[in-house]
Amino acid sequence: MQADFWQKRWERDQIGFHLAEVNPYLQQYWPALGLAAQSRVLVPLCGKSLDLIWLADQGFEVLGIELAEKAVEDFFREHQLQPQISQHGVFKVYAHGPIELWCGDFFALTAEDTADCTALYDRAAMIALPSPMRQRYAAHLNGLLPNGSKGLLITMDYAQEQLDGPPFAVLDDEVRQRLGGVWQLQVETERDILGESWKFLQGGVTRLVERVYRLSKQGAAR
């Protein structure tokens, strides 16, 4: 999967993955993380998610990373915000108040860039990537945030052979293999959502589970 895949999806407005409301799991489970006010939250592959506004409204600073510039521009236009635009290395930065959206490749992000982030929110990043890229994504993510960081990860679990992604199937075993050496993982909830997902029903999927993980970075085992 190449970068232009997502660029074209945004240009053609093929964004069925975009939610027209704040994610209910975020609202339910984020407060229990107990983060300090004004903690900086890393949101990979953020799109124009309404979750960004919700996080800012709760008193957090938001660092969203998004490849498609159209998504970033749409976010600020739809919320009638006038961003300040600057350059940070290879990233074009759009900033307004507590929200910064960095337009560019997530894999160009460095630990120095995220040194002041102490939280992570991944609703649509890991499940957006095919398996080889997920391995690379997880390895890169593991090296970004400082120890003690907390966050939420939301995945979808189904038989990948029944339907092509995205969103891709990310099974519990994979999450634990990719992240478990660095992050403490706790399943907050898992829910069968097949009945709510016409695309998957129509595609012949027989089981679809949405799973929410609570993350706490403990550092690599020695």
Curated annotation (Swiss-Prot):
S-adenosyl-L-methionine binds at residues 10, 45, 66, 123. Keywords: Cytoplasm, Methyltransferase, S-adenosyl-L-methionine, Transferase. One of its GO terms (cellular component) is cytoplasm. Its EC number is 2.1.1.67. It is found in: Cytoplasm. GO terms for molecular function: thiopurine S-methyltransferase activity. Pfam families: TPMT. Its main location: cytoplasm. One of its GO terms (biological process) is response to metal ion. The keyword Mitochondrion does not apply. The keyword DNA damage does not apply. Belongs to the class I-like SAM-binding methyltransferase superfamily. TPMT family. NCBIfam families: PRK13255.1, TMPT_Se_Te. This is Thiopurine S-methyltransferase. It comes from Pseudomonas fluorescens (strain ATCC BAA-477 / NRRL B-23932 / Pf-5).
